[in-house]
């Protein structure tokens, strides 16, 4: 598990899967925190981002000055990962199934022809998270 202690407004945590080419990135550049599903085999950084999810808007946090802990936990096969903030799951990426979801269910896009990643919904899925966590500790 890769972790970072940070104060909202400036954070960067990148975590590589043991199963290349997958990478998960948590980033907060000021107004908001995002979680990215990335494919390192792509030629440009722009093309490497498979999906992006809003984790929080800084102004909506109860105490934006409070120090927090971000952690990225990978599944044993390296095909899935979860972003935890202060121990609470906030986002899930399944690289094999090409889907992601988060607590904010944002952003959602109209699915376009040729899209290989599900982007029309980021709705939270408790069952998938429970399965992920059960497999970790089995």
Name what the model sees in each region.
Residues 1-4, 34-63, 91-115, 125-138:
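Surface-exposed loop/turn elements that mediate protein-protein interactions on large endomembrane-trafficking
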Residues 3-20, 26-30, 72-78, 117-138:
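Blade-terminus and WD-like Trp-Asp/Gly-His loop motifs, strongest in beta-propeller folds
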Residues 10-12, 49, 56, 68:
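Amphipathic, alpha-helical segments enriched in basic
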Residues 25-29, 38-40, 84-87:
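Beta-strand C-termini and the immediately following turn/loop, strongest in propeller blades
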Residues 60-76:
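Short linear interaction motifs
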């Amino acid at each position: 598990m890769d972790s970072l202690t940070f104060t909202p407004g400036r954070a960067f945590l990148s975590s590589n899967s043991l199963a290349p080419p997958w990478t998960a990135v948590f980033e907060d550049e000021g107004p908001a925190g995002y979680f990215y599903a990335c494919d390192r085999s792509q030629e440009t950084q722009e093309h490497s981002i498979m999906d992006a999810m809003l984790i929080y808007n800084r102004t909506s946090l109860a105490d934006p000055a409070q120090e927090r802990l971000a952690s990225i936990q990978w599944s044993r096969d390296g095909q899935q990962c979860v972003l935890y903030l202060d121990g609470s799951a906030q986002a899930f990426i399944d690289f094999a199934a090409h889907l992601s979801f988060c607590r904010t269910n944002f952003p959602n896009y109209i699915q376009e022809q040729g899209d290989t990643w599900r982007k029309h919904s980021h709705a939270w899925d408790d069952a998938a998270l429970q399965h992920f966590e059960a497999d970790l500790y089995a």
